[in-house]
């Protein structure tokens, strides 16, 4: 019970950093790719890790009260396609189940870039990551700086930042 309460407290603190941004279908619906991911626990997002998600497509349902994400994960060099549907809650966070329970929200958005923060909780503990999805292959210098800043705000070491485009052989 104490572990559960600590996880709930940690989730509340991690989500208090930023106001959750609303998104609309016109901003989201379409093909996306994962550009960068940075995590406090690199093991889950390393090559072959269950949270190293190579986005393919995102789509809003019910005015973005649901967010469907289609992505690939490479396990044993084989691409596996997964679909999750995040349900939006009053606080603006989405929740879904994949490799544990996930609580995610939009940190920042432009026409072709969306920064997400995700907290993943499973039987082995809690980990958090920032993921950048885009409609192009890289971030500009200011956006890379923004990713570093966001990682620092969530106490995620910047040296854990990984550029996923070079390793994304699933979406070619």
Curated annotation (Swiss-Prot):
Annotated S-S bridges: 60-64, 79-170
Top-level taxon in the UniProt lineage: Eukaryota
A biological process term (GO) from this entry: sensory perception of smell
Alphabetic keyword roster: Disulfide bond, Olfaction, Secreted, Sensory transduction, Signal, Transport
Entry keyword Disulfide bond: yes
InterPro entries found in the cross-reference section: Calycin, Lipocalin, Lipocalin_CS, Lipocln_cytosolic_FA-bd_dom, OBP-like
CC terms in the record's Gene Ontology section: extracellular space
Major location category of this protein: secreted
Compartmental location: Secreted
Signal sequence segment: 1-15
Family: Belongs to the calycin superfamily. Lipocalin family.
Protein name: Odorant-binding protein
Gene encoding the protein: Obp1f
């Amino acid at each position: 019970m104490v572990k559960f309460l600590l996880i709930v407290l940690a989730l509340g603190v991690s989500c208090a950093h930023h106001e959750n941004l609303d998104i609309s279908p016109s901003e989201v619906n379409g093909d996306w790719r994962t550009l960068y991911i940075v995590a406090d626990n690199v093991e889950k997002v390393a090559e072959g890790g269950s949270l190293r998600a190579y986005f393919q497509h995102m789509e809003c349902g019910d005015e973005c009260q649901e967010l469907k994400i289609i992505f690939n994960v490479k396990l044993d060099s084989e691409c596996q396609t997964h679909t999750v549907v995040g349900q939006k809650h009053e606080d603006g966070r989405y929740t879904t189940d994949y490799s544990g329970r996930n609580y995610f929200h939009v940190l920042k958005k432009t026409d072709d870039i969306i920064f997400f923060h995700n907290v993943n909780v499973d039987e082995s503990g809690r980990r958090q990551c920032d993921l950048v999805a885009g409609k192009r292959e890289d971030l500009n210098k200011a956006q890379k700086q923004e990713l570093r800043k966001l990682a620092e705000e969530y106490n995620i070491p910047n040296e854990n930042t990984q550029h996923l485009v070079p390793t994304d052989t699933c979406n070619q």
